[in-house]
Structure formats: C-alpha cells, structure tokens
C-alpha cells in the first residue's frame, strides 16, 4: 500500500519526514500546498492513501482517483473539505488525525 501527502507545506513535510519509520507504508510528499481538487488524480497516481491537510476533495473528483481507498485528514473538520458519507459509499474511508 502506498500513499501521498497531497498538499504539504514545507513545515509539515519536514515534520512528516521525521516521523517516518522503517516498515511504514511508502508515502510520497507533494510539497505544493496550493493544489486544486482537480489535481488529485494526477498527484495520487493510483495511490491507495491520500493524506490531506487542507485541500477539498469533492466526491466526483475522488471517484476519478483510481485505487484510492483511504483519506487521512489532518484535522477535525473533514466535512468542511469533503463528504465522508458519500466517499464511504464509493469505498473510500475517511480517517481523522
């Protein structure tokens, strides 16, 4: 299983890199915090896990992300950025961190 931190600013990227350990799933860090929702399919490139700091993930865009199964949202107000129930209906599970 592999993931992508889709919208990391430099500070979050450095922190995330420091937390990675041997045996963790492969996670690529996209160091562009200014992505648009339409860029998700290209940035994820088939990854099963999207780690999201602040970029909206509309359900219609999520459906275009081949292989996406899990969204890890860094915050407590995921509903402001995505619809967890709609995503679950498509087989994509939202997790809060």
Question: PLM features: residue spans?
Answer:
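N-terminal glycine-/charge-rich "phosphate-binding" loop or analogous flexible N-terminal tail
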Residues: 1-49
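Phosphate/diphosphate ligand-binding glycine-rich loop within oxidoreductases
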Residues: 48-97
């Amino acid at each position: 299983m592999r993931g992508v931190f889709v919208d990391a600013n430099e500070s979050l990227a450095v922190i995330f890199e420091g937390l990675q350990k041997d045996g963790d799933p492969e996670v690529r860090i996209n160091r562009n915090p200014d992505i648009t929702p339409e860029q998700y399919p290209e940035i994820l490139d088939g990854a099963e896990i999207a780690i999201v700091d602040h970029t909206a993930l509309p359900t219609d865009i999520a459906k275009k992300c081949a292989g996406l199964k899990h969204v890890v949202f860094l915050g407590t107000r995921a509903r402001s950025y995505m619809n967890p129930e709609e995503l679950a209906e498509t087989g994509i599970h939202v997790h809060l961190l």
